Amino acid sequence: MPKQVSNVASDDYLTAIYRMNFDEGEDVIAVRMADRLDITPPSVAGMLKRLQRDSLVEIDSRKLIHLTAEGHRRAEQMVRRHRLAECLLTSVLKLDWWKAYEEAHLLEHGISDVTEPRLFEALGKPTRSPFGYPIPGAGIPYVLPMTTLAGVAEGTKVIIDRVFEEDEELLRFFYEEGIRPGAPVVPEAVAAYRGTLTARVGERTVVMGTQVASHIWVNALTPGPSPDFAGEGSRRSARGSAGRPRNG
């Protein structure tokens, strides 16, 4: 495999581990990576062996996958470039919001050590991506709330912190329904057996699948006590829902 192709593939694995762990609070194991990346478990196993050989990941006795210091550095660099590319696409090129993730994935590997700081300056030193994720190295703490809309009690008003960005169809649904970082939202009713949640987003009433709601991370409306969360673990709220959610 040519070195450039190999590096791109390695970076994709490293960033997937980084996002699952730091952005979504997942315990990262091989089967979840296969589901997330939509590739076969044997392919994941082969790449993990290569990443271990290169001292980029470690696998502990429970089969949990961890980034080494160098793996974390590599992943964080690619995440930073990806999110800067998203900002470029949406704020400068005016690309449709829901298309930015996929297009940024094509651009991120072309951003160099020379162009990255200039891009950061030209964009006005953004601190978050269009989808609400912190940009590493932008000067804000990388501490994210791990509670999703699916875990908020009915009638509790919260603010959307960030949304799952890796599904263009889902992002378009979010956009059309006003589900964006910073928007206020109140879950009004949960139909557990139907798997749906009805929420008020701004002035709109939106019905979505509970799996979709688990891909919307939220913050308390104002500083102070945490909102009344309904039993969903704040650190593991996204577990079991990685991959390609649907809005039904």
Q: Across the structure, where does each feature detected by a protein language model lie?
A:
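A short, conserved structural fragment
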Residues: Q52-S61
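Key DNA-contact positions within bacterial/archaeal DNA-binding proteins
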Residues: P42, W98
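Mid-protein regulatory/catalytic core that forms ligand/cofactor-binding pockets
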Residues: E108-S214
